[in-house]
Amino acid sequence: MIQKIKKDWPDHWKIILESNNEKAPMWLRVNPKKITANKYIDMIASENNVSKSNLGYIGDCKYSVCLKNPIQIDSLPMFYDGYVSIQDGAAQLAVECLLNGKDGRILDACAAPGGKTGQILENIVESSQLTAIEIDPLRAKLIDQNLERLGYKKDILINDLNDIESWWDSEFFDLILLDAPCSSSGVIRRHPDIKHLRKVSDISAYHKKQLKILNSLWSTLSKNGRMIYVTCSLFREENDDVINQFKKKHDNVAHGDLLLNNNIKKQMIKTEYGYQVLPGIMNMDGFYFACLEKKN
C-alpha cells in the first residue's frame, strides 16, 4: 500500500503517511432546517462549559462544524432530535457538489450508512423525489435509524445496483450520487486497521466493481443530468482510471465543474478528471470527486 501511495502521489506521499497516523478531528453537519452552524457551536460551548475558540470552528463546507477534540454523542445538544449529525467535512462536500441549487428526481446509490441520504433530505425542497438504494439489508437498517433520528421516513430499496430491472421504474434521475465502494485508503486515520487488512490486489477488484456500477447507473441518468462519482480512496486506479475507462465506453459524457467555494477548491488537487482532497488537508479525510454530466 505504501509503495502504491508513493507511485500515485510522488510529491505528497510523505504528508499522506503522516496524516494517516494522526488523530482525526470530529466533524459535525448541522441540520439547516433546524439551526445555523454558528448557533449550534455556541450551544455546544455553553452546555459543555468550553470557550468557542477552544472548541472548534465553522467549516468552509455549508452547515459544518469541526471540533478540535471529539466529544461524546450525549454531549452534543439536541443530537437525538436531529439537529446535528457526525460526518466528515469531505463527505459533506459530496452532497454540496450534487445539489448545487438543483433538485428533481435524485438517486443516492450505495446509500448506507445514510449520512449523505440525510444531508440530501435536509437540503432539498419537498417536491424533489429521493430514491436511496443499498445492497446490504443490515446496512440498510442503519439508514433507517439515521433518518428516523433526523425526523424523516424513507423506504430504502434493498437491491443490487447492477440489476437495474429489479429496482428502476424507468423514470430518469436528474441527479445521481454514487459513493462507490472502495479501498477506503483516504480514511485510514479513522480506521487504522485498513493498513493491515487491505491488499494491493483489492484495488483492482474495486476498480472493476466501481466501473460496473458506473456503467449500469449511467442509463438511468436523464439528458443534461448530473452524476457525482465519489470515493474515499487515494488511488488513481479507483478514481481517474475508472472515469477514463468509463468515458471510452460512452460518448455522451461531459465533465462538470465542482461548484464549491473557492477556499475549498484551491486546497483540493485537480486531477485529470476530478478533484482530490488528501487526508489532513482542511482537517478532512481523503476523498475524490468527479462531476459527470450527460450530454443532450
Where are these regions (language model features)?
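S-adenosylmethionine
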Residues: 1-296
